[in-house]
């Protein structure tokens, strides 16, 4: 059912489940050389997450801040849990956390955003990850990128973004520095081929 809905949206020209790849002419420092995964797009605007910006906070920092664990419990966490990746998802609501994850984990608050990827923004998934009971693939993002009605479409028309279908492996890759060039490679494009004033895909 979710897949049918997503296909219908794409047929109407919306970009749910797509990558936005910033063109060289993107002079807004918030978005220069970014790869964004679009989670929602309609006549009312768009929402997505930057996939290649690091975040200083660690997962133990988040657990302590939310008072989900005490310091002694955090110390005893397995290294894979302590190193769970947190990224800066965008300039809007930077104190709010979101988890993009594979669809093997679902709660009442999980929202499908592509055929195999869901979004959960409640504490239940943070608790599950801290207990080793979370999804197989996941990344936590603080903040998001948002656009008002028609804003994203205008930016694309003005050659601000390239677009292409998202790739799950790239979404969850921990190698943030490589994501921009790898996203371009999905389209058969290299950074050297782009100019600040040439077209979008």
Swiss-Prot record:
An annotated GO cellular component: cytosol
Gene3D superfamilies membership: VC0467-like (3.40.1740.10)
Source domain of life: Bacteria
One Pfam entry name: DUF179
InterPro entries linked: AlgH-like
Family the entry assigns: Belongs to the UPF0301 (AlgH) family.
Name of the protein in its database record: UPF0301 protein Smed_0532
Organism (species): Sinorhizobium medicae (strain WSM419) (Ensifer medicae)
Highest classification ranks of the organism: Bacteria, Pseudomonadati, Pseudomonadota, Alphaproteobacteria, Hyphomicrobiales
